[in-house]
Every structure is written in C-alpha cells, then in structure tokens.
C-alpha cells in the first residue's frame, strides 16, 4: 500500500487535497532544454529533466564531447548571477541559458584535476586493450562442459570471452593523442615563477615532447609565444596540429560510440576482473591515481574523522523526531551521512590495522606460534574499537556470532529471539534505532578479520549534543569508497603500505603442486570432521523474517475481514492467535449473542469460563513481553492487529519457524516461478532471500522446492558450491604465513576447485583429486545446506562460480581466458590482489524504498499516473537523503526511467537510465546486476528512439554479462534473446532474428514449462514472425497455444487473454483471406516446398519473396488488406495509410515500389519544413494523386542529438488506457480505413477514435469500435467499384482526429505507438493538418478483359515529401528470363502497364532487396504492440518476464514487454544525421538513372529526380531478386499451374514454414555469413535495411530487472 504523504495534512480537507494535487503535478517530470555558452563562444544544448540541478548540468557538460575536458569553471545566469550553487534547480532558471566562466586554479589540486581529466579522456585508447597475445593456455577451449539435455540455449552470438570484458570501453583502434605525460619538479621543471605549480612533459601522438607549466592562470608551453590557456587540451591544440587531429578523431569516436553520452572515462577498478594493461603497468586508472590527485573515493582517507564522537551522535540520532515524512527525511539524511562517514572511516582504519599486523608478522613470523582465532591487535581510536584476529585455517562453520555486540554476548537462542522481537516490532526507524548494529563493521582481508565497534560515553555526551551537524557528501554522493582501491597487491608494492615482495611472473610448478597437496590434506581433515559433527538444532532468525511475518498476518486478516459477514464474524477479531485462543471473544460480543439465541446458553457459559482463564493467561503474557519490549514497541505490536502481543517468546519462535517453512520458502519459490522475482546470480538471490528474512542455509530446501524451475535450482546449486569453495579458499589463505606465497596458494586452490583432473591413466578412471573434491562437496552441501548432490558438478557454469567466488573472497584476477578443461587453468600471475570484504547494515531512506515499491506496484497494475507520482517522489527522497549521484539513487533513476518509458516519454526514460548507468558503472561495478539491467533497459530505449545499431551494442553488452552470471539457461537471457531478435530484424537480419526467437521459445518451455505465461509470450512472438512470412495457418496454431495458456493461467476475463483472443481473430482472418486468394487464382508458394525437407530461413525468405500474384478481382479485394498488413509488418514504421486504400489492380506491386520511394525520399529530404504540392501521376487508365503533408504541422523539429520532444501529457489515462492493448488487431484494421494522408502522429492519436478502449468482445459489432466489420464493409464497396467507403473513412478521420486531439493519451495507447513516437495531443496542429490534407479518389476502368474487366484504381496518399508511386510489371506466367527484362524498364515505361491484366501484376514478399527503409514518416501498425508493459527485468528492464512483474526494477512482463513491441513505427522526430539511419546505396545508385525519361508530371523538378532515382533503383533490385529466386526456387511448371490447382498450397506452405522455423539453424547461420542475408537476396545497405518493419518483440522483453537495486 502506498504510504500517505504528510505534505497534504491540513484541518481543511479540501485545501489539503488541493495541495496534494498541486504537489503531484509539480512532481511530474518533464524534459528541459539547457543552453550553455562555452568559453569558445559556442552554444551547447543539453537535454535534461525537470528534477535536475546545477550539479546535474555539470555532469552533462562532462559527458559532452565539446566540454568534457573542462574541470575548473563556474556557471552564470543573467538573472541568478555568477557562480551558481550546485543545489539550484534548473527549473528556476528562466530563461534556461547558462554561461561557462573559466576560473583560476587557486590550488595546485585544481590543476592536478585538470591534468587527471585529460589523462582519463585519452586512457580509453590504451588502458582497456592489451596488445600482447592472450595468456590463455588453450584459449579456444575455454567453454565449460555443456549442460545435459541441452539445458542451455544455443549461443547464436559469439561466445563471450573474459579477455574481451573491457573491449566495450576501448577505442584502441585510434592513436592516443598523448603517448606519455610526466610531472616534473625542481630543476627539471625549469625556473619557477610566482603562481607556477608544477611542470609537465607531454609526449604527443607524433612523438614530439612539449614542456608545459601549470600555473594559477592556466597552462602555457615553455618557449612558445602563447598566452595562458585554461585547459591542457586547448594549449596542445594550439601548439600541435597533430594533437588537434588526433583529439578530434577521439571525440568523433566518442560520438560514434554513443552520441547521447556514457563516455568511456571516469571508470574505476571496481570489478573482480582487472584490465590487462592496468595489471601490467605500474599505475592504476587515472581516476584513482594518487600521483595525479586521484583516490579510491570515500571520506576520512587522512583520518580527519577518526576522533568524531560516534557514540554520542549515534545515540542522538535515535532520538531525533520521526513522526512525519518531513521529519523522517531530515532524520534519514543525517543518519545516512553519519553512517556513510562512519563506514568509510572504519573500513580504512580496519584495513590499515590489518596491514600493520601483516607487516609485523612478516618481520617476526609471529603467527606461527599463536593459536587460531587469537587476537593479534586491539586498538582504540576515539570511540572506535578495532580488534584484529587471525582467521581459522580450517573449514569449520564461519564465526558469524562475532557480528553481535561484545557488550552483551548472547547465545544462539537468545540472539534468535532478540532478532524476532526486533522484526515484529519494526517500523520505519528500525535501523536507526538499533545503535549497536548501526555502529559495527566487519572487514576480512588476507586471512585476517577486523571488527570495528563504537564504544564511548553516550549518556554524558548526549547532553552536549542536541543535533548532528554534518556536511553533504561531496560530488553529490559520487566517488564513494571503492573497496578495490584498498587492495593488497601481490606483484608490486601496494598502496596500503605492506612490504609484500614482488612475485615472479612465471609460474612455479613445484610450489603450485606443493600447495595442492596442502589443500588436499585440508579437505581430508574437514571431511572427517563433517562425518563426526552434528547439525545444530538451533536455527538462527533474521529480523526481516519478523517484519515479513507481520505483514503476512496483516494481509491475511484484511482478506478475511473483507469477506461478507457470517455467523462466525465475532471470531474474526482473534484470527491468527493460534488454537489456544481460537474461541476467545470479547464480553460485549458475548452479551449480544446471549440475547440472540437461547440454545447457545450452555456454550456461552463455557466460553465465559474460557474467557476468564484466557484473560489470566493474557495478563501473564502481557507482563512477559512488556518486560522484553519498550512501551512504544509493545504498543506498535499490539496495533498491528495480529495478536502476536499475546504470545510468549517460545510460541513466537515456534510460530515464526512454521511461517518460515510453510509459507515463506514456498512463497519465494512461487515468486521465482511467476518471474515476479528473477535472480541472475548469487548476489541477487542472496538479496531476495535476506530481504524476506530467509537464511542462505535454506538454499538446499529452495532447490528442492524449485524442482520444476531448472534455472532456479541451478542457481541455488551454484550458489551452494560457491559458498563451499569460499570456506575452502578462506581456510587456505589463512594457512599461509608468507604473503609472498599467497598468489601461488590462491592459484593452487582455484585449480583444485575448477581445474579438470577427472580421468587418469590409460583406463581413464577418475583421479584421486577428483573423487576427493566430489566427496567433500557432497558431504559439505549435505551438512551445510541439506542438499544431496548428484551429478551437478559435471555441468557447472565455472565462470559463474569463479565470479561469485572472487566477489565473496575479494579476489582480483587478470582479464584473460581461462581453460577450465585443463588441470591448471590458473597461474600465480593471474592473481592480482585481495580486496577487503565488508559486512555492515545498510542505512537508507525507508520511505524512499517504500515509494519505489509502490511505484512498481502501480506500474504492474497499469496505473501509470500513480507510478510516475510515486517514482518521482521516491527519486526526490533518495536525492534528498543520499545525493543525486550516490549508488542508492541509481535504482530510483532506473525505475522512474521504466515508468516513463511506459508512458511514452522515451527521451526522459533514456536520460534517467543513462544517469543510472553512469552511476552503476562507476559506483557498483561493471558487471553488477544493476549495471546489466541498465544496459538492457537503455538498449530498449535506444531502440524506441530508432537507434537500432546503438541498441544492439548495449543489448549485446547485457547479453555478454549475462553469459558470465546466469548463462544461457535463464528466463532473463531468453527475454534478452527476444529483444536481440527485435533489434536484429530492424537492421535486416531476419534469419538471425528468427533463430533468437526460436531459442527463446525452447528455453522458456524447458525452464518455465509449456504452460507458463512467458512461454505464451514466446509463442506469440513466433506467431507474429510467421505472419511476416505469410504462414498464417501456423500463426493461428501458435496463437491458439498462446490463448490456451493464458486462459488456463489468467482466465478469460484477463486483459492479456482478451488481447490474445483478438490476435487470434486477426491471424485467422489473414489465413482465411490467404485461402480465398488461392481459390480465386492467386498463386501461393509452390506446394513442393513441403517436400524439400528442412530449409534454412534464408531459403524460406527467398522462396516466399519469389511468389507471384495472379488474377481475380475478388481475390484482389480480399488480398489487398493482407498485403497492406504485410507491408506494415515489413516496414514497422508509422502508418503508411496510402498503401491501404489502394487500387485493387496495382496495389500489391505499388506498395512495394512506394515503400522504396518513400525510403529514399525520406532519407534524402532533411528539411522538415519542406512541403511538396500534390502531384498527379497518370499512367493510362490509372490516375494516382498523392498529397504530401507538411510534417512541421505535426512533428516537432528534430533535435541535434536525435532526441525528440516529449510531453508529459502522454502519460494520462491509466484507467481506460489499460484496455487499448486488448484490441490491437482491431486497431490495425480500423486504421486501414483512415484517409492515407495523415502522418503517423495523427494516426496514433486516431487510435482513440477507432478503438474506444473497451474489452474485446467475441463478436465484433458494427460500431466504429469494430474495425474488422468496418473494413469488410469498405472492401465490399471497393469490389463494386464504389469509392464511398474511402470517402467516409476520410471524413471520419477528419472529425475524430480533432476530437481525439483534445484527449489525453492512455497507457495502452502509448504501447501502440511506433518506436520513438512521442504522443502529445495537439488539437490545433491536427486541425490545421486536416485542413491541408485531401484525399482524391479517381475511378477508371481497366482496359483488361475477361474476369478482370472490372478493376478500380484508388489513389495513394503518401505523407512524405518528394515521393512518387510506380508500378512494377511482372508476369507470373512468364519465365524467369522474361522477368529479367524489368531491369531495362525506365520510369517512363509506366504507360506500358495500360491494358495489362491485374493478374500480370505480381507481388514481392519480404523482399530482401528492398532499399533500406528510412523510418521517417509512416506509421505502420505493429502486429505485436497491443500490450505495453515492461517486464521486470525486461528487458533487463528487469526481470524479463511477461505479465509477471519482476520485482525491483522495471516491471513489465515479457509478454507485453518482450513480445509486444510498443513501438511499431518510427519516432515522431529523429536526427537525420544519425549514422545508423544514413542509406549506404541510394545515392550511388541514383546517379545511374539520371537520364531516364519521366512519364509522371511533377510540380517540383527536385522532387521528380528523387522519385525517379528511387523507382529505378527499386526496379533493378526487384528484378534481380525475382530472377535469382525464380531460378532457384520456382519450378518451371508453376507458370502453367491453374489457379484451381494452386488453391490448396496454403497448408503445404505453412508446413514448410514449420520445417524452416524449427530446424537447421546451423545451416541458416552459415548461409547468413556467406551471403549476407541469405541466398538469392540482393545485398543492400545492411545497417539500414528494413528498419521500419514491425518489431518482433517489445522492448520490454529484453529488459532485465534486478530487484536487488530496489530492495537492497
């Protein structure tokens, strides 16, 4: 339930309510355009959001290529003045024009920051790519043993390698502008003048060395007659042209990598993998290089907070007022800042203490005589007590009891009871009020454990403190303490001051084998102990269990009390008290019952006696719990209404255990099954369990319950084995006394755990080591987790285990490929260092986290207004408490991005998600689950903005990381496959897209079951893909399966079920039309296709593309709509209505030609203001009128960076909008009735008119809400040579568009919008556009005879500039040689079509030779855009899963998210300069036909030329395609086959499609690689090929969500 906001509290309810509404309205985010004037007097336009402050503007400038090198400057505003404070809201700056003012370097550190920034910018050219060959022993065999029974999906993409981990950030193909930079002082720096700080020797790209001096006024070159330059970049550009060109190339590479930001600098070493160049060099990454003023982040690095009165301030913290939300925000901020400062200080103090002990032990060898677990150091610094102990060199249970406060040592039973009472009485302040837990930190490193506690005077000191004064975190919370910066490095002197000797780079095999023997002995000893020890009967309890238990009981009571009253109503008040108090009733209730029924007198008397006895017992219980709890805590427990305050400690403990076993664990597995939770690694699994109070020792139980969920069971098994190996590795590290031998010991341990020594000798019998390892694992997992291991070890994902092991122990490895099939995959040189592993409580805003959960819940229910409101409030709270760039705030950015994505604000969604990604990469880690989620989400948002190649880059990065976490056998990976398929299709890789979809379906069936709703989503995706290939019968079969699953799982009344029913109805209509077309003489694919056996996808596409049309007036009438929809499928842009009300005779060929013309002209016309007058195209009997609509009337101007203007109004309508997705097929049909002169924005808005957002009825009515009936009526009129239906549709469009423009768009309408389209009702512009637009329909009689004598010619309206329609002549009865003559036809040959039969006009299907389609102005209905929600990862928008909400992150289920692409068409506005949208061949081809005759009169000569070039290009490509496909696929007898004989080809075609879709992926992939798209295809600009086709899947499906980000 959403928390109530206290801001609206008032004695006057009306005023309070109005205030709340105003607050909500103000909180609604919106796009903000910020113009900044640079020191070069140029203007930079930044895309921000309304929640931004000046500090966000600085971050945006740091991510812009023109200003990224500036560090020391201030911002000024003509109204607000100079040196604006970082906390000033951007919305308060009106006008939003800022100016950068360079400031003097008043301190040397500021000059060092400038140098560090420049080094950081150029680091991507050298620091993330190693030129040395890979050190992998057998790099080609680095793949683990495949899982049994094909549990993993087929790796369609290239198998990722660890050595490629940092290539995503590398720009190594460019020469670095700076080869070397050295700081010089003293005599080498030359004469030092007043104001000079230090000298620099800069070796630039051409080898020249430039001597630079840093001073207060800036930088200047020695010996050059130049004034000071504010930045080094400016100075070097002035001095050297070579540097200027190299730097310009680097900035261009940044833009090509991602024009919207996310520049690859500022990264930190925060991942378990270290770049090879960094591991080989002597300096860390520039951000953390202390030589240039960098550091590992955090506070108190110099000990400035060591003597802070921690005890007193933590005590004061617990007393701060926290009754209202405003009070809690103030309290939470102080608690967060104080605790963050305490954690940073304590961790650094603990690491320093451990290093001191290590140095002492290395000099004296003192640890050899000390017993294990003895205290080696005890120190007090102010209120901090630091105790360092040596870890026990055995595999005994971990001494987690040390985490409790030493002031009062509790037994296991007492600790469990204490935690349970803490949980059942928990409120928003539970963390802050637990001062002992808040003031404790445990740090492990190199076999030592340091415990830091706060011990000091509290009561006496509290009198001196009334409040806590503490500064905000620097840099908005960015640059938090990076634990990896505190590493102990093994191969060179490390930063923390220990004296570890340098380790030789060559592996000492003798030492490796000696340590391997030690490890084996250690395992044997532990194996014996495991046989002797017994499992403890005391079960620990986490306090979170009590909190979730109370919530469960409260929900249960609410559900029961919500039912109709019964005779037992009086017993409901004591529900949940257990059997002992089951019959207790209040005396007032009993007196009423006595007077009601005399027959119950005896029973009531007994109840009175029981009441007396019970009351005495209750009084005793009251006394017991009151003694244990404070009065406030006891009151809270009593007010919960659960009756737990009546229980004793023992009863509470037993009931909690019952809840744990019978409800909590099964519910967790149920959430896993429904994909409400979808963990991808051990970290997210641990977070999910801990947040629910579940112990990790229950992993074995979870694995048993998840027997039908292979991915969850596998994840549990991997986590259990990882934890077992963790204990073994810690024991080995603790047994090493000589730190120089530690790398060898670690490498030997990893080889023992992950190396392969299964078979030995000629008989290939299992080796001794293998048997010992397996036996120990089985026994350890059985005792520790209750899991009986079988043969899982043979099929482990060793990469996942290695990753988890490094994170749990603190290992840093070099990023290279490890051969796990060898006995020794690791060398000592692979072990870079050990980083500290910390354990402490998390202190964040509980209200903020509650708001995040409320936002996710509202999103799941389709209440977008509430989701936006809660998400924005959560973000505001997180920023207020943690700062805008703290790692805790990133999850709020990410969730709000997903919510805004669902509302259609793709630009805002992208901005917020980029913020989240930048934070996650730098603060959490490059492979953190939240970082993976951001990659997946951002790829979907880029996809919606029509940047398909950029989207592919980021989705492939998410897929790369998923490979090393959960592997291919996971629903999130399957959902990502669906996203990849969607994006691959947009760049022309249809065959690859189908393979991804096929693997996703198989994976979901295997992992989730054939009846899971996510499997239904995959079936739907395949159905849509088959529909693209006109295998409509198969589409019906797949959609029937989808409907059956959803009906069984969700019921017939669910919106998703009704949506599937509407889709099925659509597919059935297409199949019927196809059959009717066959019966009326229109040829279908050769029936012999079924006899060809397995075909590759490319063969299938070749074959389908070669199908010709034949005759039949009725057939044309029936087939017209199918072809129109096919065009829509292929283009997936904005409704090209001109192709729908087209002529029966020429519509098929004309549609294809028109698409090519539109593509070319749209890509060549960049001026949005261009208006082309109506053009007549006369070709004998055919008269076609085209009206070009001024795009400016509907579209906003295209922004420089490719962003579109977004409107917050598009987010309204969470109620009615919810229903729109159920009628997606009807929407498409209705939209075909619209006049074809509206652009796609108008069409999107017209959806409201033609789809009244009502549930799909089984029998469509004749009203406007039934598009199918309306379409059929229109078709009937066309068949009778009547143009009234078209005219009526035009009139309806004109009326309803105006009506719609004044309405707010709903949630589901946004889902139907094309990718990148921003939906904003614009009444005035629509009316203006409608006034300009006309539809003229001319009827002529065809000169053909026979059954084709009657044919209508219908005008085609194209909403684009400079586009002409042309007919292509093909004779289906002619041989392939005659078809080849098409290549010589010019544009003037259109007149030759006069008198031809319509049967002579053939069609092309899924033509791979089509010119790359520019998604500029059409709106084509997306066949799968009926639903609009993102899965929780969906897309790593978080848990990818279909309607099921994946917790913590983006919640859009994969069916709607992954399968139903919200976007069908092109965005309303795009950057025409975007590289991925520039056609590669259109210009060069157009020049070849400049001299051809034109048979069409055009008002504009430039328009004519563009149209001629496009038409001729299409004719040449079409002819080439038809010749190839006809020669290879179409039997010679096909031309002589009668229509009657061909009418039965549909089923054969569909069966053949089945063979193709489900077989021979390998052949398909090989063909694709050889022929670039399949045999028989004309190669076109691949990057832009058919970009506007319908999305196979919704963005949401690919999004992958990590709940941990929200539930941390």
Swiss-Prot record:
Keyword flag Protein transport: no
Species this chain originates from: Arabidopsis thaliana
GO MF assignments: mRNA binding
Descriptive protein name: Protein REDUCED CHLOROPLAST COVERAGE 3
Ranges for domain Clu: 288-564
Keyword Cytoplasm recorded: yes
Family annotation (PROSITE patterns): CLU (PS51823), TPR (PS50005), TPR_REGION (PS50293)
Lineage of origin: Eukaryota, Viridiplantae, Streptophyta, Embryophyta, Tracheophyta
SUPFAM superfamilies: TPR-like (SSF48452)
Biased composition (Polar residues): 1242-1265, 1373-1385, 1535-1546
